[in-house]
């Protein structure tokens, strides 16, 4: 069973994925597969990376960058 939680409500893993990132993960199966293989620490780091954008445009750019890295199999997102 896939343990990756993408959606609304309480995440059983304690990780709340930003809506924009979750939407991209749903549309990008390879990125979602990589995200599912990431450790909890790596997932938290990726989410912090996305959320640390100072503007909405910066957050969108960070989401695109994170998705591209995950599509390439990278789990250390920066």
What are these regions (language model features)?
Residues 1-78:
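Charge-dense, helix-prone N-terminal extensions
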């Amino acid at each position: 069973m896939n343990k990756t939680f993408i959606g609304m409500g309480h995440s059983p893993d304690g990780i709340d994925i930003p809506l924009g990132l979750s939407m991209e993960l749903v549309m990008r199966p390879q990125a979602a597969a990589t995200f599912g293989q990431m450790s909890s620490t790596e997932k938290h780091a990726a989410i912090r990376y996305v959320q640390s954008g100072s503007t909405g445009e910066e957050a969108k750019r960070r989401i695109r960058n994170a998705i591209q890295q995950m599509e390439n199999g990278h789990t250390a997102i920066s």
